[in-house]
Design a protein with these regions (language model features):
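Mid-domain Rossmann-like dinucleotide-binding core that forms the NAD(H)/NADP(H) cofactor-binding site
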Residues: 77, 132-209
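Glycine-rich beta-strand-centered segment in the early N-terminal region that forms part
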Residues: 24-41, 53-94, 102-107, 125-127
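N-terminal Rossmann-fold cofactor-binding loop
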Residues: 186-190, 221, 244, 270
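NAD(P)H dinucleotide-binding glycine-rich loop of Rossmann-like/cofactor-binding domains
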Residues: 82-163
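N-terminal Rossmann-like NAD(P) cofactor-binding module of classical short-chain dehydrogenase/reductase
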Residues: 79, 218-219, 241
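A short acidic, Gly/Pro-enriched loop at the edge of an enzyme's catalytic core
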Residues: 210-218
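Glycine-rich phosphate-binding loop and adjacent beta-alpha segment
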Residues: 179, 225-292, 321-322
């Protein structure tokens, strides 16, 4: 089976461990189904796996990828929900301490076929293209839960999105604008600030710039580099929702005094539930949102996509056609 896999790991040269080509096809576990992948997409999670983060070396080789859309055995067009719960777990799977993402314990989506529990399939709305559908299961689902479940923002509220340009950030901008929120975004890069405006941001600012007003919520994925700015940008009683720390997880100042004095809420957010993915897909289709796609490549050119992501030269999702 043709697939993209991690065969070795390196923090200094992660792409040295990337294999693009044929690999032995894994068996289908009992009560799981095999999906013929039509499109799949890249996430920073895949780069971290190549660096040895979240993927122990004894599980190599491991097919990478968390995002996919394809056809079920009955011909249905589906999105793949990539969170695998532990046996017998009940409730919100994002709170399952033994949960995993595809490509951590079980083979991922960057392949001709992917195996998942039958309950992990979500119908693909007719209004979504295959390329758009592949964008949703990881970055877009993360942004959806951040905004609508954890920040609990309402039309007319002001949301600050830190680090415009990445997959979660671009998704948050597009989703927030479609929901009637006022969206402000930051980036060090002028081109990415322009992209944020094109996607629906009302205003854009250089990273760390003083804002004209306090905001109701901050969508934080950058971490250490923007943490103090996020805290200082909130109105009293406002909310920071954090789902990543690409610049590091140890800010120079924790800002604890400001957090308790201003009664700020700091909420961690990881992925989302299958039901949230279904609602997200319906919302995107109903609102006519076109997820920002940086590029579409054949899966055989996956290395090019990985190289661009590693260089930070990305504005939106990188999608692969199988």
């Amino acid at each position: 089976m043709f697939a993209v896999a991690a065969v070795t790991q390196s923090t200094d040269d992660p792409l040295s461990g990337l294999h693009v080509g044929d690999i032995d096809e894994p068996p289908v576990p009992e009560d799981w189904v095999s999906i013929d992948v039509v499109t799949c997409a890249l996430n920073h999670h895949d780069l971290w796996s190549l660096k040895g983060v979240g993927l122990p070396g004894d599980r190599l080789p491991m097919i990478l990828g968390c995002d996919a859309a394809g056809q079920a055995p009955d011909g249905a067009e589906v999105l793949v929900y990539p969170v695998i719960s532990s046996p017998g777990f009940q409730g919100d799977v994002t709170n399952d301490p033994r949960r995993s993402l595809l490509s951590e314990v079980y083979p991922g989506t960057l392949a001709e076929r992917v195996r998942v529990p039958a309950g992990n399939l979500v119908p693909k709305p007719e209004g979504l293209s295959w390329e758009q559908a592949a964008c949703l299961p990881t970055a877009w689902l993360t942004a959806y839960r951040m905004l609508f479940t954890n920040a609990a923002v309402h039309p007319g509220d002001t949301v600050l999105v830190q680090g415009a340009g990445g997959g979660v950030a671009t998704a948050a901008i597009q989703l927030a604008e479609a929901a009637g929120l006022r969206v402000w975004a930051t980036s060090r890069d002028a081109a990415k600030r322009d992209l944020a405006k094109d996607l629906g941001a009302t205003e854009t600012f250089e990273s760390g710039a003083r804002l004209p007003d306090r905001v109701d919520a901050v969508m934080e994925t950058v971490g250490a580099a923007t943490w103090s700015h996020s805290v200082n940008s909130l109105r009293p009683g406002g909310t920071i929702v954090i789902s990543g720390a690409t610049s590091g997880d140890a800010p120079a100042k924790a800002e604890l005094t400001k957090i308790f004095f201003k009664q700020l809420r700091v909420i961690g957010s990881t992925m989302g539930t299958r039901d949230e993915l279904a609602r997200l897909a319906r919302f995107v289709a109903d609102k006519g949102i076109e997820p920002q796609i940086d590029s579409v490549l054949p899966l055989a050119q996956a290395r090019t996509g990985f190289e661009r992501m590693a260089a930070g030269d990305v504005g939106g999702k990188i999608v692969f056609r199988v």
